Amino acid sequence: MDLSYWEQKEWLENIDFAIVGSGIVGLSTALFLKQRFPESNIILLEKGILPQGASTKNAGFACFGSLSEILQDLKTHSENEVLELVQSRVQGLQLLRQSLGDASIDFRAYGGYELFLEKDSAVYENCLEKMSEINALLFSIFKADIYHLVVDRFQFSKVK
C-alpha cells in the first residue's frame, strides 16, 4: 500500500492502540478503550473497505449457544465453566444492546432454531435426551426453559 506523507503522519503515528478488525468485537473494543482512555489515539485496521468477518454475515453475537453447542462444551468444561460462559455471552449481548440501543442495531429477539440433517440423527437424539437436563442447568440464568422441541417448523426435506 502506498501512503502519502500526510496519510502516514496523520494515520500511523502516535498510536496508543491498534485494533485489527472492524466488526462487532473490534468496534466494541475501540469504543470501550476510548471511554476508558479518552485522550488515547486509536486506529482500527481492516483488510478491505468493509468488514469481512462473521459480524457482517450472521447474528452469532446474539446467541449464547445452541443445545448441541452447550452439550459439546460440557464434554471439555465443567458445568460451572459452561454456566459462566453462557452468562458471559448473555451479559455481552446486554452490554451491546445497552451501549448501542436496540433500534440502532435493529435488534429483534426472535429466538433461534437448531436444525439437524437426517445424517445427524445421533446428535439429534442426544439433544432430545439431554434437553430437560440442560434447561435445568441454564434455568438460573434465564428463569425459564429455553430449549423446546419444534417439529418440522420450516418443512425442509431431510431435516429433523
Model-derived features: positions:
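Flavin (FAD/FMN) cofactor-binding and adjacent substrate-gating region
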Residues: 68-74, 98-160
